[in-house]
Amino acid sequence: MYKMKRNTLFVRQSCVSSSRIGTQLPLNKSKIYTSSSINITNYKQDQKLYTRHYYTNGKIFENKKVDQYLKVTEEMVFSFMNGFTDGCICGTIIILCLINT
């Protein structure tokens, strides 16, 4: 089982700064489990504004690359995050992928 963790910090106006994680994975993995959480906190008032968790389970076929699946997951979370503007002060997104052999 492989574990990949991505922690993305974003600030006011939903400016996204992310770093891609490169890893060597065989293409014949059967399933991928994705767990992602979003936490938005106003640190000036020490108040948690929003928390949400996503859990998905999908199959990966031999002709489908893992990087493509992670890119789709990343775009889904970032498009949701871009809906926040002034209300988004500071927060983190953690995406944990477990690839089952």
UniProtKB/Swiss-Prot annotation:
TM helices/strands, residue ranges: 77-99
**Subcellular location, record wording:** Membrane
The record gives the membrane topology as: Single-pass membrane protein
One GO CC annotation? membrane
Annotated keywords: Membrane, Transmembrane, Transmembrane helix
- Keyword Transmembrane listed? The answer is yes
What is the protein name for this chain? Uncharacterized protein R900
